[in-house]
Amino acid sequence: MKTLIYAIRFLARSKSYTIINLLGLAFSLACCIILMRYIHRELTVDTHCLDREQVYATVIDLEGNRGLSSFNDYQYDTVRIDQRHIEHYTEYTPLEKDFVIKEGERFFTRTIVTDSTFFHLFQYPLLQGRIALDKAESVLLKKDFATKMFGKENPIGKTIRHSNGKDLVIEGILGEPTCKTSLQFDMVISTTLSTRWDRSATSIYRFMPGTDIEELNRYGSIPRYANDPQWDSRQYTFSFVPMKDVYWDDSTNSAEDTMFFYGSKSQISILTGVCLLMLLTGLLNFVNLYLMTMLRRGKEYGLKKIYGANGKNLFIQIWLENTLLIVWALLFAWLFIEVTQIPINRLLNTNFVYTPFDGWLSLGILLLLPLVTSCYPFLKYNYGSPIRSIQSIGWSNRSVRSRMCFLGIQYILTFLLVVSALYFNRQLDLLLHTEPGFRTKNILVANLVYESRDFNNFSEQRYLQERARTQALNEKILACPFIEYHQSCYESIIEKTYGTNYINAKGESAYLNIMYVSPQFFRMFDIDIEEGSIPEKPERSTYVLNRAAMKALNFSSLGEAAVVEDNRKRRDANAPMSTISAVVKDYYNGHLTAGAVPTIYEVSGFGGPRYQIAYPEGRKQDLLNYLKETMKGIYGAEEFTYTFLEDDVKALYKEDQKIASIYNIFALIAIAVSCLGLFGISLFDIRQRYREIAIRKAHGAGMKNLYQLLFKKYLAVLGASFVVAVPIAYYLIHQYTADFVVKAPIGMGIFVLALLLVAIISMGTLYWQIRKAANIDPATVMKTE
C-alpha cells in the first residue's frame, strides 16, 4: 500500500511530464485499438457460421472462370460424394437485381433462395415471427428492408408480390449478426417456390468429423465435362473451401457484386504495419519520458541499493507507476474512440459494436503493457552501479544519449508513416486522375428490364409478353431525344465478364476476356480503332481484339490475326479460324494497377437487361424523367436502379482512398505523439541548461549563438532519423507496388516534403522553450540555480 501511495505521489509531483506522457500514450493506444478492432472484425468474418472451419462452400472452376457454385448444375459427368460423410447440406441461389411489389410500388432487393437448413448452419438473430421456409409462399425479411417497406407497421403476415408474379407471406424478420458477413441479402425465399432460376446455386456442406477434405478436393480436381462434349467440350473442376477462407478468396467471380464482400490480405498487412508503428511510437515516447522523470530519483535509487534494497521492490514500484499511467491512458483512449466513433465508422466503412474482444483487448493491454514498459527502466537502475545513479542526478551524457536514441527511433517510425502517407496520396491522385481510356462522363448505367427470373414459370406466352415489353422499351430508347448512344448488356464496361482460352494459327493459346457488344459500343465510349474497321450493321458476329489480346497471342498485325476458341477446337479439330475485323486501343476496365485485360469483343445484336446510355451535357434530369415515364408505361412502376459510370469508376478506388486516409490521420497523430515526446524532453533538457545559458550570455553570447546551441542537438537527431528512414521507406513502398502496372514514381519529392513537414512541426514545438531560455536574465538564474 505504501508503494502505491508513493507511486501516486510521485506522478502527481511530476504532473507536467505525467500529463504529456499520458496524452502521448492515450493517442497511440486509441489508434492501435481502432485498428486492432478493425483487423479483428476482418479476421472473424462469417463467425455466425457454426464451426466455419468445418462448413464448406463449393467452388467451381470452369476453364479459368472460378466462382461459388454447385456441381449439381453439371449432369453429364456424375459426381458422387459419399452421403455418409455429409452431416448437413444446403444451397442458396443469389438474386441480386430482384424486386418485390407492395401496393403498386416496386422495391429492389437482394434475395437468396434457400431452405431452413441454411439457418442451422448460419445464425441470424430472429427479431419477429419465426424462421420458417416450409411453405412455397414463405418469405423472411431483414430488419432494414422491412422498415423500408412498412415503416413502423408490423410486417408479420403481410403479403407482397415477388418478381415472378407469385404472392409471398412474411413469416419472420431477421437482424444482422454481430460479425461481418461475406454474403449480404435483404430477403429470403423458399426453394419450394421454385428450383430453377437464372443464377446458379451455391452448395454448402458440413461434413462429418474425420472426413478427408484433401481427398475430396483431389477427387474434385479431376476435369469433368460440363455438358455433352459433342457440342460443348468445356471441362470443370471443383473444390471445397472452408467458410473461414471464402471471404479472402477474391479470385471467385461473382456477378452479384453487391451481395458478396471480399477481403484483402494486403490491406490487413498494411493496417497491421500501421498499428505496430503507432504502438512502437507511443511506447518509445512513454518509456523515454518516464526515464527522464526517473533521473530526478537517481540518488534515491542509489542509496536504496547501498542500504540493501532488493530488485523486487524496485520492480514493483516501477510497475505500479507504469500501471497507473497506462490505466488512465487506456481510459482516455476509449473516451477518444467513443467520441470519434461516427467518423471512424465512415472512414473504415464498418459499424463497430462492442464485443468480448474489446474487453480482452483492454485486459491484455493492462496486463502486458506495464510489464513491457517497466523492463528497460528496471534493468537500467537495478543492474546499474549505485554510485553512477547518485552521480547522474538529472544530467549525464549517458542519459542524454539514451533519450536522444529513443527520440531518434520515434522519428524514424514517424518518418515511415509520413512518407507512406504522402506516397499513397500521390498514388491515389494518380489513380483518380488517370484517364481509363474510355469515356466516363455523361454515361448512365441502368437496369431497365424487370422480368421474372423464375424459369419454372417459363411458357411461350410469357416469353412473347416479355419480348413485347423489351421491344417496346428499345423503341422508346431509340426515340428518346436525350440519348446519344446506348448499349444493352449484362455487364457494364468495368465489370468482370466470362473468359476462355483462344488459339492462334500456330497453336499458341491465351486466356481472353469476352465482351458481347454492339457496333455503337466503341463510339459511345470513344474507344479508338487502331486497325481495321467495324461494320455498322453486321450480318453475323464480328470479332475485335484489343492491343493486349494481340500481344498475348503474339500477333504483330491485323492481317495475321485469326483465332478459334479452345473449346471449339477440342470438339472439332478442323474448326475454322475466325478472322479479326479490327484492333482497338487498350483501356483499363478495372483497377488501374491491374493493367489492361486481354479482351475479345463479339460484335452482334446480343443484349441484356442493363443499359449503358450516353447523354448530352446538361440533359441528365431530362433523361431520368423520360426513363421513369417509360418504365411507368411498360412495367406499371417508375422505379429503376441506376448509377453513373463516372461514380462507378471512382468506386473502384474506394479501398485506396480508405488506406490513404488512414495513413494521413495516423501519420499526423504519430507526429503529434513524437512532438509531445520532444516537448517533454526539451522541457527537461533545456531547463537543466539554464546555468550554462546564463554563463554564456554573461560572456557575450548572442541570441543567434544560443539558438544554434539549443537547436543543434535536436536537428542532428531529426537528420539522422531521416537518413535511416529513407531507405527503409523506399524498400517497403517498392515491395508493395512491385506488381502494380500503373504506379506513382517514388521520387525524392515525397521524402523532402516529409522532412519539411516533420521538421517544421517539431522545430515549432521547440521554438517557444528555446526562445524562453535564450531570453533569461543571467543574474536571476545564477542566484536561483
Language-model segment annotations:
Residues L4-I20, G24, L284-L325, Y383-I393, ...:
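Intracellular coupling helices
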Residues D115-L127, V139-G263, E475-A651:
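Mid-to-C-terminal secondary-structure elements
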Residues F261-Q341, N345-R346, W360:
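Hydrophobic alpha-helical bundles that form the membrane domains of multi-pass transporters
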